Amino acid sequence: MSHQKIATSQRHEKACTSKTTYKDWLPHLQRRVKCDEALPVCQSCGSANRECRWPKPNDNIDRRFLSHRQSRHHKRALDDDVSVVAQEAPNDDQKVISIDRSQTLVLHSLEPAMAHQAMAHVLEPIICRHFVDIYYGLIILPGCHSDFYHGWLTEILRLMSSHKSLYYSVLACATSHLHSIGECVQMRELALTYYSRAITKLSQLLVAPSQPETNDGLLTSIILLYIHGCMGWGTYSDIPRHLNAAMSIIALRLWNRPMGIDRLFDFLAVESVLYHIFHMTTGLWTELSGPNYDSYIDFWYQAENLLDRSSCNTPSRRLASPVIGIPIALFRLALLLRQQRRNSLPLSIDMQSVQSEVFGYEMMLFGSQEPQSTSESSNTQEEYYKDAGSLYAIIVSLLWRQMLPYSEPGPPLEVMGGCWQIRRAIQIFKKYEHDDGWARCFIGNWPTYTLGFFMSATEDKQVIQVEMQRRWDLTKFAQVNRYIGDLQATWAARESQNGRL
């Protein structure tokens, strides 16, 4: 027994007196460096432009006080507020919102005050991930130039850390979208809370001594706020003031540049403002009045001229437009004819010039080939832009033919289903009837909605109805929901009127 103790003592002494070299510790030093797990995105992953693996809610629990009843990580509190369950087995009475491939966030009924406080800590990383993985791809055109797509997203994630207004704008947009997906009232209230915080932070930033025209975080926050008004819920009436703020910043930033736009973000910002000017001033067809068109037209002409002479406006950039995707002149012509229809006044512009533009787009439609199936196309996204442009050109043609100087204001009138414009539009819709990418592309929302007013045949209306419903199912944008309601109400009124005749 004594010999064993001596041997053990000798081994211990030898181990203690031996020198530990750098090579002995090298395996321990070569562990993979983890993300710093900072909100909204870790700096190392953000700078490397790689996917950031965010910690799951369970990874952030301090288990030392887990059993304490007042701990925010107490098991009962988690069960009452938010629980993460397997996606395969949600309960029928629960509101389910898909977050990623492996998990589903299940929101139980909560009191609003509890929802805003208890849910925020757990939800904000997940909401940010929803913005990155799902929402962002719906507010920028599919297949746009990679410098636009990845560049703007990387910039948003970088600026969120230092711009609280941008951080809350991102949360507001993503949370409102989650509300549309899951129809959870608490998520809508939470989205409006984030929206209010973003407005507060913006106000503080604007009164501080600074140069707003050089602040990309400020402009991005404003862009997301008017996108929230357009695509989200509860802030539609705020869009004009956000647009006016963005227009003022862009004017200060770009109007005096003789060489045009040389930064991709500025190009994207100008296109975004033009699209939402179009959205706001066109409004719903049943609205007899709307925003003052004259207050936007000067900005539109200057912005259009700026984009035309921009160094970013190369042929490859035009094919990969981040927001508009069709010729801006066609966009403007559709806006002009829609405005004339609303005001029911003689146009104060050169009618001959408008007629020449309309005939030019009609010749383009006649000269282009019949729509091919998407499987035959070498560039699907390019086909999206081309066919969306054809739909706008068809609308311009139909509006021009219905334009009378003193006609009654209101929606477009029905036309015969056999006319060439309607046949061409139906061909385009049937081409993409199984293409979800097309239905997610937001530039097709307005022409699909507008063409529904021209349809007279039941089968043609059915095509439009299916297309609009598919767009709602795939995007959950409030814009599409408003369009569907307006179109269906008009169809019902026309059927009722025809029944009385």
Question: PLM ranges: what are they?
Answer:
Residues 169, 220, 266, 271, ...:
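Residue register of alpha-helical TPR repeats
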Residues 1-159, 163, 383, 390, ...:
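Charge-rich, intrinsically disordered regulatory segments
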Residues 125, 227-339:
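Acidic/serine-rich, low-complexity amphipathic helices located in mid- to C-terminal regulatory regions
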Residues 98-213, 284-285, 311-318, 371-386, ...:
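C-terminal transcriptional activation/regulatory domains of eukaryotic transcription factors
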Residues 11, 15, 148-151, 155-158, ...:
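Cytosolic regulatory protein-protein interaction regions
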